[in-house]
Amino acid sequence: MLTIGTALRPGATRVMLLGAGELGKEVAIECQRLGLEVIAVDRYADAPAMHVAHRSHVINMLDGAALKQLVAQEKPHYIVPEIEAIATDMLVELEKMGQHVVPCAEATRLTMNREGIRRLAAETLQLPTSSYRFADTDSAFFQAVRDIGYPCIVKPVMSSSGKGQSLIRSEEHLQAAWEYAQQGGRAGSGRVIIEGLVHFDFEITLLTIRAVDGIHFCAPIGHRQEDGDYRESWQPQAMSDIALQRAKEISAQVVTALGGFGLFGVELFVCGDDVIFSEVSPRPHDTGMVTLISQNMSEFALHVRAFLGLPIGTIRQYGAAASAVILPELTSQNITYRGLETALIGDTQIRLFGKPEIAGKRRLGVALAVADNIETAIEVAKKAAGNIEVSGE
């Protein structure tokens, strides 16, 4: 039976978030609801989750020694990675020393780079995926592209939010694509994956929860991407019963193989009744922010319940809902927001993340809406997001 101590007291139950962005902030809030003591960690100060944590630290999370030292200092009961750029080998070591890594250290290690999870899905589990090759030199890259054929996609094996990704349509794009991929990796230049282009009707995120009371699924989430990052997401995404069942079967296989308790964001391509595995994150997914308004329990609440070893019970979906990002372009270390009175009309909500600065384009918030149908929900969310005026000095 779970015992939760009182935060800031000797018997506190401590949760350390590795990554303190907008997703980590919502996880921190859900932890606070249960009286957990929250320690937020990121590479920069004043990150969103730090605003709602009991304590915060700024370290290079790719530095295993620094991470180990901080864990020894804080003695968390749960280590919750919220981003990929972490010294995952150290997480494996810490788990062997008795630390509880969410969902488990092996899941974070495998999913930190696209090679680990692709080989697990395609080679170990024999799941349908796009054709693929890996390369770590320009000559191997050029040969891999020739093997896959045009058009194809190149991505660093370690990157996020579309960084370093490009679509290659012909040989003239090869050199530029290689150089861009080398610039976009989280750990600097290195290995890339080359994937054959999948022709699909739509892409979904199937939020899959592995918990003490079994495997649970949220309704499928559709989304639109631009420049490798999501712009709008909606729930539920309409799809055939056969495709949904196949999506659930694939997702269940993946999360079972990864192990541990928590919420996983499984990305899948859907073409008619066929489903192809794309990627998985062993943590809440950015497209899943729509669940802040669309369900009785958000993806963040579900993640916390699961990793604490609590039952999930019933997930209720409230009908057509959508999210739209607030994505301004400016440079400022003193960001201000206006227009909330206009944005908050009807069944809408706004989340402003509280990021400390912006240089260029950056996701600073999200608008949420429910409506009678998906198309209307998307339009209402987009309009609400567009009504937020962002400025800075």
UniProtKB/Swiss-Prot annotation:
Keyword Thylakoid applies: no
Gene Ontology CC entries for this record: cytosol
GO molecular function list: ATP binding; magnesium ion binding; phosphoribosylglycinamide formyltransferase 2 activity; phosphoribosylglycinamide formyltransferase activity
Family matches, as InterPro entries: ATP-grasp (IPR011761), ATP-grasp_carboxylate-amine (IPR003135), ATP_grasp_subdomain_1 (IPR013815), PreATP-grasp_dom_sf (IPR016185), PurT (IPR005862), PurT/PurK_preATP-grasp (IPR054350), PurT_C (IPR048740), Rudment_hybrid_motif (IPR011054)
Residues covered by the ATP-grasp domain: 119-308
Enzyme Commission number(s) from the entry: 6.3.1.21
Catalytic activity of the protein: N(1)-(5-phospho-beta-D-ribosyl)glycinamide + formate + ATP = N(2)-formyl-N(1)-(5-phospho-beta-D-ribosyl)glycinamide + ADP + phosphate + H(+)
Pfam families found in the cross-reference section: ATP-grasp, PurT_C, RS_preATP-grasp-like
A single GO BP: 'de novo' IMP biosynthetic process
Pathway: Purine metabolism; IMP biosynthesis via de novo pathway; N(2)-formyl-N(1)-(5-phospho-D-ribosyl)glycinamide from N(1)-(5-phospho-D-ribosyl)glycinamide (formate route): step 1/1
Subunit and interaction comment: Homodimer.
NCBIfam families the UniProt entry points to: PRK09288.1 (NF006766), purT (TIGR01142)
Protein's recorded name: Formate-dependent phosphoribosylglycinamide formyltransferase
